[in-house]
UniProtKB/Swiss-Prot annotation:
Protein name per UniProt: Translation factor GUF1 homolog, mitochondrial
General remark: This protein may be expected to contain an N-terminal transit peptide but none has been predicted.
Function (record text): Promotes mitochondrial protein synthesis. May act as a fidelity factor of the translation reaction, by catalyzing a one-codon backward translocation of tRNAs on improperly translocated ribosomes. Binds to mitochondrial ribosomes in a GTP-dependent manner.
Domain of life from the UniProt record: Eukaryota
Length: 651
């Protein structure tokens, strides 16, 4: 029987391989029929009317194949040559290619000739990130779209971030084109995934496209579905000019390069435009579309997405979500984009304090390129001058650190992540925001009458039924409150929990992956604030408070966290000539302690026999000297040691 199953499996695999070899051939024939072997010219782009323009995005969970499918669509329409080296063409950052994830949303304009009517259509494709930390990029991209291709991995099924991005699209009334990707994989189960999509999103089975981003199978059907189901832009081509600023990045040669969508009217090279937000005036020096390289055009019309370069080089003059209009012709601003809300804060300091100006320049340029990052200067007694930066999540922070190192050569120390708390002291009437432990006085915080609120999130977790118990145990340990538990199908369970953001921001994702053997996924959304018993925990080295190691923790977790922190500190600090006490304290109450024993010099080595009192005298003298050193000595903590101590996990 076992041999029979092996033979049947080989036959199935062989048939599948032949089937997809034929689909690759059909993809090649479709490519030859639908495209020319070159990107579109400026004249061809400008000739497409608004009625034959489609703005759409590809949305999905991370690693479900968005960028790979985008590569096939670009090849199919001739935007790029068909080449085996085409991988993540729209992922231009080094960190994106190294990690295999999309961090920055990218736009590209392609021409597609629809077989059903023979007409050429201008399709503006926006490739979006899939990770929860980059939801701001997704939200910003969808604001320029009229529809979205919702991609689901046929080998994995609907995931937590699939649901999150679906509701983002639904909130904007976008037309949805459902598609199951990776159908060429032998482990793909299209019918099961289609049923999940029916249950989770209310789509019809016959509307679910079966595609392969790897082979290009049915890629032409994706384009046809976009033309058929996604409406054209609704702007007024004859109305007053209104341009939505979607993104901005800095070019070393051209200065600020703005990614824009023309909502109404026409914008031409040489026009004078003004900002609704600041009132500042600009002159349009260059505009065009991305094909995916910049293609200059003389004008951009209502509904089109492209780039614009003005006479202002400073990126800070460009505010994402701003509305631009003709100078001296004021208009009603567009709805714009909801500002990003930082969820995690970290202190960033240079390893060498002399490199602060270099770090300042690097942070300034990166924050201008990433509107979701906030940065304010901050000073630490231990680490010197640095920045308190706000991020959308830990992956977002990690990518920012990596870009600082790769693009600017900045070596940094990142403090432990904190979340934004709100504090109201006894005599105050309103709450104040607190994003850093350094903003709170040490010694007995909170004082009597002080109220503290911590941020909450509603987490959506999708896992297999046999690990539900472990996931529930993890959520309860993180002070979670269960809101809902449903079966997506017989192999998927959806859990919804209300959790403190501080518990999620630390290592929740890693613990979830560990307890579910890597199969559980989760996404979260803001759920407001709630009162909580938060305390400031200080770390003392030889009796002196080290401000860089201060943290805000829940009282119930303080002792566990304190023990772990002083244990890591003991491992990292070099031994001294005297005994060093490491303590974690809540005000004056010590909750954890470790001791680094002194290095012992053998002062009796020169004594060769004789009276024992001579040895005792030397030992007493050594002991007194160490007591004096312990009273007046300062332990110097190297910056490299801080980097190891402040990591989330213990080695």
């Amino acid at each position: 029987m076992a041999l029979r199953r092996v033979l049947v499996d080989r036959i199935v695999r062989s048939c599948a391989a032949r089937a997809f070899a034929s689909t690759s051939a059909s993809y090649a024939s479709a490519r030859d029929a639908l495209k020319e072997e070159r990107p579109p010219t400026a004249d061809e782009l400008a000739a497409i009317p608004r009625e034959r323009t489609r703005n759409f995005s590809i949305i999905a969970h991370v690693d479900h194949g968005k960028s790979t499918l985008a590569d096939r669509l670009l090849e199919l329409t001739g935007a790029i040559k068909r080449d085996g080296s085409n991988k993540q063409v729209l992922d231009t950052l080094p960190v994106e290619r190294r990690r295999g994830i999309t961090v920055k949303a990218q736009a590209v304009s392609i021409l597609h000739r629809e077989p059903s009517d023979g007409q050429a259509y201008l399709l503006n494709l926006i490739d979006t990130p899939g990770h929860a930390d980059f939801s701001f990029e997704v939200s910003r991209s969808l604001s320029a779209c009229d529809g979205a291709v919702m991609l689901v991995d046929a080998t994995q099924g609907v995931e937590a971030q699939t649901i999150a991005t679906f509701y983002l699209a639904l909130d904007r009334n976008l037309a949805i084109v459902p598609a199951a990707n990776k159908v060429d994989m032998t482990s793909a189960d299209v019918e099961r995934v289609a049923k999940q999509m029916e249950r989770a999103f209310g789509v019809e089975r016959e509307d679910v496209l079966e595609v392969s981003g790897k082979t290009g199978h049915n890629a032409e059907k994706v384009l046809s579905a976009v033309v058929k189901h996604v409406p054209h832009p609704s702007g007024d081509p004859n109305g007053p000019l209104r341009v939505l600023l979607l993104d901005c990045h800095y070019d070393d040669y051209r200065g600020a390069v703005n990614i824009v969508q023309v909502a109404d009217g026409v914008i031409r090279k040489g026009d004078k435009v003004s900002s609704c937000a600041s009132g500042q005036h600009f002159e349009v020096l260059e505009l065009g579309m991305m094909t995916p390289e910049r293609t200059k055009t003389d004008a951009m019309y209502a509904g089109q997405v492209g780039y614009m370069i003005t006479n202002v080089r400073d990126v800070r003059s460009s505010k994402v979500g701003d509305t631009l209009h003709m100078k001296n012709e004021p208009v009603e601003p567009l709805a714009g984009i909801r500002p990003a809300k930082p969820m995690v804060f970290q202190g960033l300091y240079p390893v060498n304090s002399d490199d602060f100006e270099k770090l300042k320049a690097a942070v300034s340029k990166l924050t201008l390129n990433d509107a979701s990052v906030t940065a304010q200067t901050e000073n630490s007694t231990a680490l010197g001058a640095g920045f308190r930066c706000g991020f959308l999540g830990l992956l977002h922070a990690d990518v920012f650190h990596q870009r600082l190192q790769e693009e600017f050569g900045a070596e940094i120390i990142a403090t432990a992540p904190t979340v934004p708390y709100r504090i109201k002291h006894a005599n105050d009437e309103a709450y104040i925001d607190c994003t850093s432990p350094l903003a709170i006085p040490s010694g007995g915080f909170p004082s009597k009458g002080t109220e503290i609120e911590e941020p909450l999130v509603e987490a959506t977790i999708i896992c297999q039924p046999h690990v539900v118990g472990k996931v529930v145990e993890l959520c309860m340990d993180r002070r979670g409150e269960q809101l809902e538990q449903n079966f997506l199908d017989d192999s998927r369970v959806i859990l919804r929990y209300r959790l403190p953001l501080g518990e999620v921001a630390a290592d929740f994702a890693d613990e979830l992956k560990s307890r579910s053997s890597g199969y559980a996924t989760f996404d979260y959304d803001d759920a407001g604030m709630a009162k909580s018993d938060i305390v400031r925990m200080d770390v003392l080295v030889n009796g002196s408070v080290v401000d860089a190691l201060a943290t805000l923790v829940h009282r119930s977790k303080a002792q566990r966290h304190g023990r772990d922190l002083v244990a890591r500190l003991k491992e990292a600090l070099p031994r001294q000539l005297y005994e060093v006490a490491l303590q974690a304290a809540l005000g004056s109450k010590v909750i954890a302690r470790e001791t680094i024993s002194a290095m012992r010099k053998n002062v009796t080595a020169k004594c060769y026999g004789g009276d024992i009192s001579r040895k005792k005298k030397l030992l007493e003298k050594q002991k007194e000297g160490k007591r004096r050193m312990r009273r007046i000595g300062n332990v110097d903590i190297p910056n490299e040691t801080f980097a190891g101590i402040l990591s989330n996990k213990r080695n």
